[in-house]
Amino acid sequence: MKVIKRSDKVQELDVAKIADSIFLAAQDVGGTDDKLAKKLAKEVIARIDKHYGRIKKVTTAEIGDMVERVLLEKTHYKTAKAYILNREKKRQVEAAKRALGVHDDVGLSLNALLVAKEKYLLRDTDGEARESVGGMFDRVAKFLASCEKPKDRKIWQEKFSKIMKEQRFMPGGRTLANSGSANNQLANCFVMPMPDDIEGIFESLKESSILKKYGGGVGFTFGHIRPKGDSVSTTSGAAAGPVALMQLINDASDIYLQAGKRRSGNMVTLPITHPDIIDFIHCKESGYNYPHINFSVAITNKFIEAVKNNSEWELINPRTGLVTSKVSARGLMEEAARMAWKNGDPGLIFIDEIEKHNPTPNVGRLETVNLCGEQPLLSYEACNLGSVNLSVHVQENHKSQILKFSNGDTEIDYKKLEESVRIGVRMLDDVVSVCTYPLKKVADTVHGNRKIGLGIMGWADMLVKLHVAYDSPKALELASEVMKFVQDIGHDESAKLGKEKGSFPNFKGSRWQKNGYKYFRNATVTTIAPTGTISMMAGASSGIEPHFALAYTRRSMGEFTLPEVNSDLVKAIKHVNGVYSAELMDEIARLGSIRGIATIPEKIREIFVTAMDITPETHVRMLSAFQKYTDNAVSKTINLPAEATVEDVMNVYMMAAELKCKGITVYRDKSRGEQVLNVGKVEKKIEDLCPECKGKLAIEEGCKKCHSCGYSVCG
């Protein structure tokens, strides 16, 4: 028998789902007999067959009514009441969805639907959505498949659409928003040059502004800019230096409000050898304001050795190549650590490690990265990103039992994951082909290398489903195992695409040719990016981050609803007799973490951890485990407790260098407190609040993200 869902999707009638809904309601009132729930579900199925058997279809509302009737007739009054309340909550969510004016034919969460409407759905002249959620995915799939062979387009369109509707893979935000629209600029990130002359500076400013106009963050290196006070021969004056130039870049970014209500962002890096490096490190204390700039110091292996040896470090004028002064290497690193301890900036990129893995050294050097640091790029290069949702690649396995609170054992569905990766690689390669790049120089560079960045999200969700603690040795082992699998399949698929469609034009002389490949479609294949709003669309945790908190306040139609507790955690607690209660849910919502709640079994507390429950060293080791099997870089925040010291930050930096990371960003809890409002005895940090809904911002993957409304600086 077919079931017609509220979203108009059609599914087969499943007795297990009915039994689960009855048992969850029973658990709300202290019930523990899952066998009774299954027996009642069979009674419901029998009555449905009797009443709807001839028409062979039934709606979810009719199923719910039948469950209520059976529970009441069998005198399970408390369970019936809980079931009715649960149905009412679902009705409220459906009403809120309808009020958004968006047809949800896929079955997204309310929060995901809000994100889709605000950022990705095409709108009419009145600003209202003119496509359904499924229509959006169909639009994207059709546009990306348009570059496939005519006889294969329909096949790939259906595969692309299916994988997005099942929330197995999501392309980057610009691809979702712009595919098949008047603005076919689909790339999220670019890198532009910044030469050391006035004409070149303003040409780069103009070109980067054009990119931002069409949607996309831009990375720069200021390593070629002469230092402040250096001579300018044409005017006999003195140079302003890189820090002053940052203000120019920031102000230009203020002009463009990008598609999807995301203001343009920039990454600025400066080599550790630059004479203005100390001013750069302290630039947020210098009176300047850079809300649209992330900035990082480009660290070399030679500098790390100098720090270890506590030796002097030479600062070199990039214009003349001459040493201008010598400073303490350790003192310089401590200054960077002190500022990061104070407000989270600057980050570090390990430029030698980045260049070591440059796939096309014959084409040019990698000098900087994109907005959030996960994508090293050549000048005038862009990268198209997308992420596989790991949380939906877990399946039941009844061979053994791991934890008593689990619903049965689980394992990674590698067959499904392989299919998702292969389709995702092809989708991103098609993005390169169909994207309209605003600058010819960008189009030429991108088509020469055809770089893509397939990554992952939902890592914390996957670990929970596998009953593995994020901060355990097993999690680190799994991280390497999963990412190696994704990388190997991604490389294999790119090689197959190279044979089918041709290798990237700069293949000759590339690392891939030297490694024995005869064909390779993409100069890079894997990247772990900040998943920003696309993880909210997929209902997944961000990238490889742990859960920021186990409860969030969700926004509904401009107002805040009651806090929402992590659904996997609720299920786990309900499977332990006598633990679940509404009061416990309120306590979890208030604390955000369960580490200190003794009434929750220890095994559950070990598995459901948050970012602040995890040591900085474990964060770095997780970053390194994924970086080992990632072509490009990995974006991840290293969270430190409020009581952490500058020396703790130093240790994190040195550990990241030792473990061959390509970049690192730290955030010490409660460190961003430049703007403080005193309201009675309560202090609130403005910088930590979402600019759209005033909810608390999470710092994840080096990027600010709001779990309440979906706001994100990084798509």
Residues covered by each model-derived region:
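Internal maturation/activation junctions in enzymes
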Residues: 205, 320, 420-443, 447, ...
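Short cysteine-rich clusters marking metal-coordination/redox-active sites
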Residues: 690-693, 706-709
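Conserved, charged catalytic cores of large soluble enzymes
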Residues: 96-157, 225, 234-248, 258-358, ...
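Function-dense linear segments that define catalytic or interfacial modules
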Residues: 141-149, 153, 161-186, 191-234, ...
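Catalytic alpha/beta core of large soluble enzyme barrels
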Residues: 110, 374-376, 428-433, 503, ...
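Short Cys/His-rich micro-motifs in 6-15 aa windows
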Residues: 709-715
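Core nucleic-acid recognition elements
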Residues: 9, 35-144, 148-161
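Terminal amphipathic helices with adjacent charged low-complexity linkers/tails
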Residues: 82-96, 299, 356, 362-367, ...
